[in-house]
């Protein structure tokens, strides 16, 4: 079935963008590693779907608020309708590529946002095409959707991009359950080429040995060494021998806590350093 749809899409030129943080503190662990994401030419809706647009697609009138109520089942029905009518949405699509309609991936969303192609709404929560992950290990570097690896209830969740309620320039990655109807969500669509070939992903394993050695060094520098140096400089050298256990424990604790806020920047993963998944 082909529908006479009038949805507006804007072209986002191919390019690259960096996603994530390279700050070393533990509070940034879920946002690491910083990595390069390359995007092809794709089309994105400048605005999220409105109630009128959604009513037109589904061919029945929605009540107030229903355009912000989503579940996986409802989303799949909508995408099926739109993919069947993809030629109507963008008549001059490149026929040499296979295209799909779906929510944007995080890389596509960031690229469109950087290029000022999209309009955001204060306090909104936009559905993304990516699965929920604890960090960016295994993230797709060619901007294809990230699928869920593993078991558990998080497989029913989807990643979302949440906009600050007062500052339009602040946004953060969050998630929403899609196994049931969920209020407060918005949907923006992309028409993007299906990625061919094996995906390129952020390596799943970090250099654990190096991270442990670095942590021991910084715990010593910020915690253990000052813990022993301070009583020595204050003329309390005897306490170093009698209370060494307390000094060591205190130094370990303080050095450990400093890691929550500061550690040296972590390496950035570039596209050419990505892991090709067979």
Each model region followed by its residue ranges:
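An exposed tryptophan-centered "aromatic clamp" motif
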Residues: 111-147, 239-240
